[in-house]
């Protein structure tokens, strides 16, 4: 897996102050994507054990609320496989931090057997995520007044509550 950028102290992509990882590789190719350079799976730098340790150190301070995954597309199968061991580490070493993920795929698509991007690690990866912003960016539905999303078709899903209830539960700003 490759990544295009890491932002420390990001306040735009999730609740509170966050560390944001922009993974590389995306087959969605949304019109007017704000990161089209990350569509290439080999854009940026390889995601290594050293990268993981650097991210864990950035996440450690008490003022950092958590980690946000963007792209590219974190839920491309190869990215899911690359992210899963790292998210396990985050949960093990920093259990109080929240994990947000943005995806151009819908919750329903991620749960449809046989569909791209569902793979053998999708369920476990989702179980490690607190909040999922799902759905493609749609230029015609772009609305700058929306918090944490670019277009009105996108949802901010409370993953633990959704998994426990069996129905989509939207995240509510605390």
Regions found by a protein language model. Name each.
Residues 1-4, 17, 32-115, 120, ...:
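Conserved Radical SAM active-site core
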Residues 130:
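Receiver (REC) domain switch/active-site residues of two-component response regulators
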Residues 76, 140-141:
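Short glycine-rich, flexible loops that bind phosphorylated cofactors or substrates
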Residues 124-127, 150:
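Short, conserved loop/helix-junction motifs that constitute active-site signature segments
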Residues 7, 103, 136, 160:
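Residues at the C-termini of beta-strands that transition into short coil/loop
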Residues 2-29:
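N-terminal pre-triad scaffold of radical SAM enzymes
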Residues 86-91, 142-174:
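P-loop/Walker A phosphate-binding loop and immediately adjacent motor/lid segment at beta-alpha junctions
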């Amino acid at each position: 897996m490759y990544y295009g950028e890491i932002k420390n102290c990001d306040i735009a992509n999730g609740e509170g102050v966050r560390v944001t990882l922009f993974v590389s590789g995306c087959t969605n190719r949304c019109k007017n994507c704000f990161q089209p350079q990350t569509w290439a799976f080999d854009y940026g730098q390889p995601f290594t054990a050293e990268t993981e340790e650097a991210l864990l150190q950035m996440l450690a301070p008490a003022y950092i609320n958590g980690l946000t995954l963007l792209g590219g597309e974190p839920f491309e199968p190869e990215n899911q496989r690359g992210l899963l061991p790292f998210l396990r580490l985050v949960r093990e070493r920093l259990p109080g931090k929240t994990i947000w993920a943005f995806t151009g795929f819908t919750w329903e698509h991620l749960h449809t057997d046989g569909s791209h991007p569902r793979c053998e690690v999708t369920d476990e990866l989702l179980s490690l995520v607190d909040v999922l912003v799902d759905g493609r960016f749609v230029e015609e539905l772009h609305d700058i007044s929306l918090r944490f999303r670019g277009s009105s078709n996108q949802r901010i899903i409370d993953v633990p509550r959704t998994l426990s209830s069996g129905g989509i539960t939207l995240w509510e700003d605390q």
